[in-house]
Amino acid sequence: MTPTIKPLVLLILDGWGYREDAPDNAIAKANTPVMDRLWEKYPHCLVDGSGGAVGLPDGQMGNSEVGHVNLGAGRIVYQDFTRISKAISDRSFFSNTILCDALKKAKAAKGAVHIMGLLSAGGVHSHEDHLVAMIEMAVEQGAEDVYLHAFLDGRDTPPKSALPSIERFEALFARLGKGRFATLSGRFFAMDRDKRWERIEQSYKAVYHGLSGVTSANATDAVENAYERGETDEFVTPVVIGQPAPIANGDSVFFMNFRADRAREMTQAFVDKDFDGFDRGSRADISEFVMLTQYADTLEAPSAFPPEPLNNVLGEWLAKHDKTQLRISETEKYAHVTFFFSGGREQEFEGEKRVLIPSPKVKTYDLQPEMSSEQLTDELVAAIESQAFDVVICNYPNGDMVGHTGNFDAAVKACEAVDHSVGRVVSALEAVGGECLITADHGNAEQMSDATTGQAHTAHTNELVPFIYVGRPAKARNGRLSDVAPTILHLIGMEQPDEMTGTSLMTLEQD
């Protein structure tokens, strides 16, 4: 009979990949006595969080949304990126009812088509191939005025990598004989997810009203001028390109990001009737606003690729069996341990509690690499000591959020802060007879420089991630993120649902 283990805690160390020691490996260079001891002492293995193992195209780096969906689902979940790319390749994208209807409405109203999204080959929040397809579709269906509002990456891509993408789209516009860049914004402004409305406001006013203190004759000059100001792609101040092209009556707007978390705030500014984040100014009577995917079920706008339901994810299965669960993280990864881990569900399951620890209000997290880890750990330790929960899901964002800054020394400090927190959590669990699983959703901090470009490496990696079981004697096997939920169920003595096709990474010696 399986002994009662309460709680079982899953610690997700965001961006903590496994890589042999290298000069730019912030994790290896950090002083991490706790993780080093746990790796040596307890059953451990490596799991795959990228490419086909998580439902992405082969070779595509993993990301936090994809990672948490797979962690919670217990099966490989084919991602929106893959789904949309397939629709483009089989041409079903070009007959998508939602997209076609919005284009027809704009044409009937003699309105323009505005396409906005992250101009990136990173494949984390968007892919520029999808923007190309949307522009081609708009022109094919008779749109006369097509405007591209491009958000620049430099986070999931090298910090200064926008110019080749801009050249690609300028060539596309020339080939089609229609379309142009209307605005550029660094994703720092256009894709905030922490209610820093002053950032969204700057990008929104450029896109919606054609207003900015920075203008440029063309997109290439805009980027080169930004570089001269010391701005990398992510931080490019919103720029109006050429003659302003504000949103006007009858226009249709298409938001081409497929990942929800960093698309919600800009979408709220466009569509929420009671929006109060900032003064939006005058509002046009637009024909349609289309989300590529559903960014939130509370947003009143159609989505071209609505969610495909996931049944019997870990949270739902625990609730069906009267188990209690806690989801806890900082602001930056709160959506990941709740919405994404629950397969796209906004509301709590029966017996689920959620705790949000505010992330520090700093421009970039290399300025405070420990982030809010101490406060997060205080809350987590208190929850463990209460013994009120059967399962706890916690994310420490530091490795990823600081890794994205490209600041090596800060990433080292981030890893050390997380290591200290893990030590506190494990000690609290030992005191109450609980157990712990430690893993990551994808890599990041283990590679901080790009050998090809010589620039800082700010993106995720394709590296495997560690998996440690701090508990009973067991044998470990390598696997993928979708094996984690079945592992949790196995360790607490529950059968897994038929929908979960993953298998436990641990075999208890008593089994």
UniProtKB/Swiss-Prot annotation:
GO terms for molecular function: manganese ion binding; phosphoglycerate mutase activity. Its EC number is 5.4.2.12. One of its GO terms (cellular component) is cytosol. It catalyses: (2R)-2-phosphoglycerate = (2R)-3-phosphoglycerate. Mn(2+) 2 binds at D14, S64, D441, H442. Its cofactor is Mn(2+). Substrate binds at H125, R155, D156, R187, R193, R259, A260, D261, R262, K333. The active site is at S64. It comes from the Bacteria. Pathway: Carbohydrate degradation; glycolysis; pyruvate from D-glyceraldehyde 3-phosphate: step 3/5. One of its GO terms (biological process) is glucose catabolic process. The keyword Manganese applies. This is 2,3-bisphosphoglycerate-independent phosphoglycerate mutase. It comes from Idiomarina loihiensis (strain ATCC BAA-735 / DSM 15497 / L2-TR).
